[in-house]
Amino acid sequence: MEWAEYTKLIVKKCKDRSIPLSATFELTPYCNFNCNMCYIHLTEDQAKKQGSQLSTDQWIHIAEETKQLGTLGLEITGGEAVTRPDFPFLYEAFINMGFLVSLRSNGYLLKGKLLKLLSNYKPRSVHVTLYGGSDETYYKVCGISNGFTEVTKNILALKDSGILPKLTMTMTRDNISDRDKILEWAKNNNLFISLYGGLITPIRSAKRSIDHLKINFNGEQTYRNYQDNELIIRKVCNREKYEPPFWMCTEFGTRYCITWDGRMTLCNCLPSIWSDPLTQGVNNAFIELNKKLNDVKRPAKCTDCSFIDYCAACPSRFLSETGDYEETCESLCEKARIRFLKANAKQVHTDNMIDNDLC
């Protein structure tokens, strides 16, 4: 059996038995960057108005309960998780519990003692997001000096220590012109990089408008930005029309996220459907969360849509863009249409073209 097939089998068995195969711990809302499109970053005063960060002991307790459920993968994120003073202690504890730990980071602080920690207790993976191809772009997007210089230096140091970072570029209107430069840098250093342009409007405590930063991935522009990337032309998944709205989400039923203030959600982009692991315990909270998620209805517009097999119809995206889980947003509909056209060898001539035969 191939590894991909084996992984699908494990995920299916976990979903059938309601076992969380993996979890995300959002350790903090704080960050050393101040990215203008971030959905979570808070100042200390803002965070105090929203709640309290979980203590070291609370995170250890949650991790112990998570371990007892059979969870294997543990993703650590923030904010910037490594800004917590107790990060080294928590990280080492999670590793020693037997979790396959992944770290998401902006990469700026992954040097010195933190690099040594990661080298001694190697994670399953380190995901580093790039925000520009120059120090100037980093300052514009993240408000940080020497960002590109420091981050790329740390990425190469991770690689030299035996940790191969997985890179992502978050594309906005402020850094899209750096895309080719970043791709070239990654290629020259034999590093894989994925492109992400689907900015989600912040709906958590870091509420702000980011419409001016979003890239309109329509028509030919989609092809220019993604070229022949497989993500554009493949089906998202095959599914029946009667399936619930989380049918396309690989995390549903097999994963959860604990937010910095102690709520259990499906992911950190879906804040309003949650349970309380601190009072219920992790297992009971996971059961309650999935019951609540199952009650969410699919938008009526999706039922007979011609593009449904090519649509990453995410309820969290619906909520952030329309304020309602049951209302679709045009940006996702357009992306699904483009995938459909590309897969069926239709030529898109203009950014605003509508094919009436397919809509």
Predicted regions and their residues:
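Short glycine-enriched, charge-decorated loop/helix-capping segments at active-site entrances
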Residues: 44-53, 140-146, 320-321
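Radical SAM enzyme [4Fe-4S]-AdoMet core and its adjacent flexible, acidic
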Residues: 100, 119-120, 124-125, 129-265, ...
